[in-house]
From Swiss-Prot:
Pathway: Porphyrin-containing compound metabolism; protoheme biosynthesis. Its EC number is 1.3.98.5. This is Coproheme decarboxylase. It catalyses: Fe-coproporphyrin III + 2 H2O2 + 2 H(+) = heme b + 2 CO2 + 4 H2O; Fe-coproporphyrin III + H2O2 + H(+) = harderoheme III + CO2 + 2 H2O; harderoheme III + H2O2 + H(+) = heme b + CO2 + 2 H2O. Fe-coproporphyrin III acts both as a substrate and a redox cofactor. Fe-coproporphyrin III binds at Y145, P146, M147, A148, R149, H172. Gene3D superfamilies: Apc35880, domain 1. Keywords: Heme, Heme biosynthesis, Iron, Metal-binding, Oxidoreductase. The active site is at Y145. GO terms for biological process: heme B biosynthetic process. SUPFAM superfamilies: Dimeric alpha+beta barrel. Involved in coproporphyrin-dependent heme b biosynthesis. Catalyzes the decarboxylation of Fe-coproporphyrin III (coproheme) to heme b (protoheme IX), the last step of the pathway. The reaction occurs in a stepwise manner with a three-propionate intermediate. Its cofactor is Fe-coproporphyrin III.
């Protein structure tokens, strides 16, 4: 029987997408709109203080395409905190116009064996600890997608021996290293938590790099034989100070 992977786990993650009710937004007064924006900016300031204390991280993105208008990404110590954030958003005046859409719940994880070091067990170095509880880069673009490993007869990731999985992931990691400085990623595990098995969040200064890295990785055996993907959501980073201009009528 194949050996299960042991993971070390970090912060909990929530990807929360919202449609914006522009029709209703246009019906309220300019003063009401500004009051709603001011209140929400105060909430963002609260999140910034949490990030400053390294107790969590967040990012807000204007979604490209019609899957959503906004994507909020939150990293926190617990699911209780993630649920509290969702509720805080809904209680604000702006929350009346932020219609809940797709969401994804997961936990940052690293496998205890490092495929980039011949499968040796990881040491919980400062680097690994930082990766488990990261500050999300405030780069211009983010891309999120869920994925799973195939469990088909004869092509079942969970039947492969640990050594073979390590080799395939090493090759996959070498492809990723080509994009160092161009793309950063956060991998979250979601088995038992959401519809897919993992979530992948990529950050880049140039969205073209999302296309390039995902395309090149499609040729890795770990992807060609064993990977399945959900929908991709791409967004542009929204600064707190931009909110008023973005929602102006």
């Amino acid at each position: 029987m194949a050996e299960a992977v042991v993971t070390v786990d970090g912060w909990s993650a929530l990807h929360d997408t919202r449609q914006f009710d522009w029709t209703s937004w246009k019906l309220i007064s300019k003063e009401e709109r500004q009051a709603a924006i001011d209140e929400f900016q105060q909430l963002i300031s609260k999140w910034e203080a949490v990030e400053e204390e390294k107790q969590g991280s967040h990012g807000i993105y204007k979604v490209v395409g019609n899957k959503a208008d906004f994507m909020f990404i939150f990293l926190r110590e617990s699911f209780q905190e993630l649920e509290q954030i969702k509720t805080e958003i809904n209680k604000t005046k702006l929350g009346d116009f932020l219609i809940p859409g797709y969401s994804y719940v997961s936990i940052i994880e690293k496998t205890m064996h490092d495929p980039m070091k011949a499968g040796e067990d990881r040491e919980l170095s400062a680097y690994v600890k930082e990766a488990l509880k990261p500050t999300m880069p405030k780069w211009e673009h983010a891309c999120f997608y869920p994925m799973a490993r195939r469990r088909d007869p004869g092509v079942n990731w969970f039947e492969i021996e640990k050594e073979e999985r390590t080799k395939l992931l090493y090759e996959h990691g070498m492809t990723g290293r080509k994009y160092a400085g161009k793309v950063k990623e956060i991998i979250t595990g979601s088995i038992g938590l959401d519809e897919w098995e993992w979530g992948v969040t990529l950050f880049a200064h140039d969205p073209l790099q999302f296309k390039k890295i995902v395309y090149e990785m499609r040729f890795d055996e770990v992807t060609t034989k064993y990977a399945e993907f959900g929908d991709f959501i791409v967004g542009n980073f929204l600064e707190k100070e931009e909110l008023s201009n973005h929602l102006s009528i």
